[in-house]
Amino acid sequence: DRRQRQMCIRDSMLTAAALLELDFNQPSLDYHELMKLTKILTRDCTEDVENMYRRMCFNVFAHNRDDHSKNFTYIYNEKDDMWRLSPAYDLTYSNTYYGEHTTTVDGNGKNPGKKELVAVGVQAGMKKTYCERVAEEIRLCVNEKLEHYLK
C-alpha cells in the first residue's frame, strides 16, 4: 500500500562516467574535474570534498592507476534531497596497460606527486597547509601499512 511505499525510500547512484558521459575505458578525466563535480553535486559538502581529496592522494601513493570514472560514485538520498559521495571502492594496487593513472592529477598521469596533489586541493578551495598535511599523512600511512605489497 501507499504507506509502505513511502517508508521504502530508495537511493539512486550515478558514477562520474555516467554524469559526465565519459568512456571509462579511455583516460578522459582529471581530479580537478572530479573535485568540481563533487562540490557541485554535494552542494559543497566539506566532508565529501575532503574525502575526494583523500581518495586522490591514496590512489597516487598506493599506485592505484585504475582510477577511472566508473570508480567514483555519488548516491542521491531522496529523504535528505541530497547527493553524497559514495563509500570508496576498487582501491587496489594496479597498473594500466598504458602505464599511467586513468584520471590525471593536475594534468599528470605518469608520475603525479605532492605538488600536483596540492595544486588540485588548492584549486578546489582547500588551504595549502591542509592539503600538504593530508597528503603527507596518507603517504606515510600507505608506506607503513602497505609497504610489503607495494614493492
What are these regions, as identified by a protein language model?
Residues Y98-G107:
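Short beta-alpha connecting loops at secondary-structure transitions
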Residues D1-I9:
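Single conserved hydrophobic/aromatic residue that forms the stacking wall/gate
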Residues R3, F72-K79, E136-R139:
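A glycine-rich phosphate-binding loop feature that marks nucleotide/adenosyl-phosphate handling sites
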Residues L29-Y97:
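Conserved kinase catalytic-core segment
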